[in-house]
């Protein structure tokens, strides 16, 4: 993918995992046509296999269709937790885990 189009490669996004969209704060402009315009999403695929959902797509320049980055988002349920991951040169890297139970056992305080 194109390192000249992004301010920072794979910025740490904490637990912000995007299934769609673009992180435009990290987009400095197209290295090919030198325009800073909207970023298109192209070739979006969604695959469901063995309790895992994988979404991939390309970020492309609106003006010249230059490929800026490849975006990958995954969702899976492991034990009692929904696990999310994102990896993209433009949008960054992130992971999140959310309990499917009403009260997250990791958030409860010990009684003693």
Swiss-Prot record:
Keyword Iron-sulfur found: no
Entry's Gene Ontology molecular function annotations: zinc ion binding
InterPro entries membership: Churchill_sf, Transcrpt_activator_Churchill
Positions that bind Zn(2+) 3: 59, 71, 88, 91
Binding residues annotated for Zn(2+) 2, in chain numbering: 30, 33, 61, 64
Family, similarity comment: Belongs to the Churchill family.
Described function: Transcriptional activator that mediates FGF signaling during neural development. Plays a role in the regulation of cell movement. Does not bind DNA by itself.
Protein known as: Protein Churchill
Protein source organism: Danio rerio
Gene: churc1
